[in-house]
């Protein structure tokens, strides 16, 4: 089979969108979240610190971080109907498929009337997304 050469088509040099959240290749390479290099965040910051940074616009101080971690922990319980759906997903399913299905089911169980509570919904999703894996390894009851 002949190797296919990559063409020159694409978005090279084109602005695809603007956001305050992240930049990709602003200085030629790399990724930043709210001005922080992703490699530094990956090495030194906790998941909750990066989530707080993305959602609130700044890295949390220790008090803000403690409050945010406690808030996320308080939102981790899963409705039984969601647990039932997740348990029926094949063990070999791709994690993104599991998250999509879980998110869709949770959206049917915890209905949003409008966008006024979007920050709370984001925090809820951040709290519950890791739980399917934890349930599989029986860390949680």
What are these regions (language model features)?
Residues 1-141:
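Hydrophobic alpha-helical bundle cores within soluble ligand-binding/oligomerization subdomains
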